[in-house]
């Protein structure tokens, strides 16, 4: 992996997280950061399962921040990735909203 550099566009959430944490996250490395991300996903799962509405905002924020950090550590612009994949609608049927015949979960 290349040295840490800011990849999030100016004004983006990813850039904000880079400005706050990039040096520390780069020192920890992608593998260590991935472990923190997985832990936060676990906390989000727990809040959802327990229907802890008061914790959802915090846990979603944490997961979003750690995901942005992981993208940055890999030199990827998270917003550009999302727009590339979903900017034209559903990646499978290309419709907005999706018209795929997905079975109900």
Regions found by a protein language model. Give the residues of each.
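Flexible "arm" and connector segments at domain edges
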Residues: 1-60, 64-105
